Amino acid sequence: TPNMERLAKKGMMFTQAYACNISSATRCSLITGANNTRHRVTNWTLEKNKATDRPSNTIELPDWNYNGVSQVTGTPNTFVGTSFVELLRQNGYHTIHCGKAHFGSIDTPGENPTHWGFEVNIAGHAAGGLATYLSEQNYGHTRDGKPYSLMAIPGLEDYWGTGIFATEALTQEAIKALDKAKKYNQPFYLYMAHYAIHVPVDKDMRFFPKYIKKGLSDKEAAYASLIEGMDK
């Protein structure tokens, strides 16, 4: 990931930090500043009031916050915290969210990035995964525009049927948002969270053939294409 490494060298790296192996927990920590022991989002979230734990006969499952996080009270099994993005907005920043959100379950306040202080939301909603990266499948929508999966990516209708991989569509939208932000007489903050490299392991055909030629298996080449598309 040479481009990610290049950005890191120009920015700030956190070398004494903990990232939970469940991505929901890490995102909730990023937005609220609370670690997963405190916010108690210890598994992935999706549907309101529904835990996603697998049944177990050997361990007692914890009572965790399966509705995610929020800035307001009133939703059970939810950690209430302050968003650093809201603090930025209150202090004059133009705030942009692009890509994966996954802060709160469906139909809770925290599911919408605007709840957290983002003035612009591009493709963020309750799900942390996605139905497909493929525009040929409308990123998880039927031809009449209805999502056929809870993980259908919203907000990318302009790219349906164009042949543009979801990762590239998000990158293009982020660049457009930054170009607009530069015209404003204020600082800006972009939270960029690609859906890649989450399953499904779809083939990004811009890069897939290259890895096949290098001798990788079909699945390995597809996974490598996701990584390069994210790093582009």
Q: Positions of the model-derived regions?
A:
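Active-site neighborhood of glycoside hydrolase catalytic domains
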Residues: 185, 229-232
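Short secondary-structure boundary/capping segments
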Residues: 32, 112-114, 205-212
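Short, structured active-site-proximal loop/turn typified by the sulfatase FGly-forming signature C/S-X-P-X-R
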Residues: 1-27, 33-38, 94-96, 116-125
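Solvent-exposed loop/turn segments at secondary-structure junctions
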Residues: 13, 20-25, 36-38, 101-105, ...
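Stable alpha-helical elements in mature extracytoplasmic
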Residues: 3-4, 10, 26-27, 80-84, ...
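Formylglycine-dependent
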Residues: 46-94, 101-188, 194-203, 217
